[in-house]
């Protein structure tokens, strides 16, 4: 199936759901990402990765990794919506646009098309966030994330850098690309907007960025050095290595000190920052495999941990946090071990920063496991179906921990 058809399915379902569904049937919005993930399985698969630096070759198709990311993220987003206590039907429109844009971005070899597609997704989300909760946090999201997409668009006309492998041009392009990736993935010092959005909006409103768009941008960021950046390659990689490690340490510490309701968001951002630092700072290592293991773990557990603590799922939440703690044989242990191995091959400073970040994430996960929630008997009865789904997701997380590389290879082909 052509990527344009898949994108049209995402967009069409999103528009129809927001126009047709009402409050009683609002939970059917989950069908948008679920069907989108289903049709992505039918995509025409390319044997080579769609590197967004290969020249103006257009949209060629999804490779195995891109297909796996979109399918896993779509299913995870559907489960996030299913487990929410309430859903706004207008979210379907934003989900449809983000899913369509993510499909085009993953299938494109044209850097301008990739940048514009990501920009369309970010613009749609930011406009919805501002409409839902106008204020400093959502306006900051528009400024910073918008600057990130603008940086990618500004860099795209210069790619590939044929004949300009040295001098100022590759360095400027490398800085622009690093700025765009850091802003879109909420890596400090450009990550404050995500913290504000997570603390202001409902989880269902943040989920399209957190569950669907972030994994896509992470994979695209990993592919960027595959093009001919010349002297800009070390600039791009070193900038993301430094800011990624700094962001991971900062996010881990604030996951301990910050509000309980924002703990998962900060842990997620810290893990993604570690992935960015390792994948870009050690591209010839097992870093990508470790990053994919962490991504699939978060996709499996996000539906549980993005649900409000007051809404139940006490024991599944505790087990989910245990799986994120990094204690063996949890899946995050293997993912972070591969990332640490990759960073240790570089220099001692990177290793120390990564160990501090991982230690902070461990402490935050232990604190979350010890949090108690009181539920009335009637509330427990009503929670049977969500708890069943939550335990199923926990079982998937345990399976990832028992066979991390095999399952990551099955999902992402890597």
Where are these regions (language model features)?
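Transmembrane helix-loop-helix hairpins at membrane boundaries of multipass inner-membrane proteins
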Residues: 1-86, 92-93, 408-413
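Structural signature of hydrophobic alpha-helical transmembrane segments
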Residues: 1-10, 59-73, 109-122, 168-183, ...
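Alpha-helical multi-pass transmembrane bundles of energy-transducing inner-membrane proteins
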Residues: 17-29, 91-175, 182-188, 254-312
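Short helix-boundary/re-entrant hairpin motifs in multi-pass inner-membrane proteins
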Residues: 31-40, 47-54, 79, 83, ...
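Small-residue-rich segments of transmembrane alpha-helices in multi-pass membrane proteins
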Residues: 32-44, 95-106, 142-160, 204-220, ...
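Membrane-interface helix termini and inter-helical loops of multi-pass transporters
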Residues: 47-61, 161-169, 222-236, 334-343, ...
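Alpha-helical transmembrane segments of multi-pass integral membrane proteins
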Residues: 347-372, 390
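Cytoplasmic/organellar membrane-interface segments at the starts of transmembrane helices
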Residues: 366-414
């Amino acid at each position: 199936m052509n990527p344009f058809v898949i994108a049209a399915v995402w967009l069409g379902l999103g528009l129809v759901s927001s126009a047709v569904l009402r409050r009683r049937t609002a939970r059917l919005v989950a069908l948008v990402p679920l069907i989108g993930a289903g049709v992505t399985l039918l995509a025409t698969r390319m044997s080579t990765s769609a590197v967004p630096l290969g020249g103006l070759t257009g949209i060629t198709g999804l490779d195995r990794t891109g297909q796996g990311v979109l399918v896993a993220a779509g299913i995870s987003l559907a489960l996030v919506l299913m487990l929410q206590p309430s859903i706004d039907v207008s979210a379907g429109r934003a989900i449809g646009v983000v899913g369509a844009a993510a499909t085009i971005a993953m299938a494109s070899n044209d850097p301008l098309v990739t940048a514009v597609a990501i920009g369309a997704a970010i613009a749609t989300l930011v406009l919805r966030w501002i409409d839902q909760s106008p204020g400093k946090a959502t306006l900051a999201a528009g400024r910073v994330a918008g600057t990130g997409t603008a940086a990618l668009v500004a860099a795209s006309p210069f790619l590939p850098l044929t004949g300009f492998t040295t001098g100022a041009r590759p360095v400027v392009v490398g800085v622009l690309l690093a700025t765009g990736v850091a802003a879109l993935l909420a890596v400090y010092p450009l990550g404050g907007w995500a913290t504000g959005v997570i603390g202001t909006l409902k989880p269902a409103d943040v989920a399209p960025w957190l569950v669907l768009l972030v994994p896509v941008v992470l994979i695209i960021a990993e592919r960027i050095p595959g093009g001919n950046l010349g002297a800009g390659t070390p600039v791009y990689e070193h900038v993301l290595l430094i800011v990624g490690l700094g962001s991971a340490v900062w996010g881990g510490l604030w996951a301990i000190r910050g509000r309980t309701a924002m703990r998962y968001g900060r842990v997620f951002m810290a893990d993604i920052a570690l992935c960015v630092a390792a994948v870009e700072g050690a591209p010839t290592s097992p870093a990508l495999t470790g990053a994919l293991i962490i991504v699939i773990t978060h996709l499996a557990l996000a539906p549980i941990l993005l649900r409000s603590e007051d809404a139940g799922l006490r024991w599944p939440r505790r087990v989910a946090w245990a799986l994120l703690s990094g204690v063996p044989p949890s899946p995050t242990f293997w993912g972070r071990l591969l990332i640490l191995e990759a960073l240790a091959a570089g220099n001692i400073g990177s290793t120390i920063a990564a160990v501090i970040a991982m230690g902070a994430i461990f402490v935050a996960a232990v604190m979350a496991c010890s949090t108690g929630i009181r539920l009335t008997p009637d509330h427990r009865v009503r929670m049977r179906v969500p708890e069943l789904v939550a335990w199923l997701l926990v079982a998937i997380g345990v399976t990832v921990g028992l066979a991390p590389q095999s399952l990551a290879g099955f999902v992402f082909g890597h």
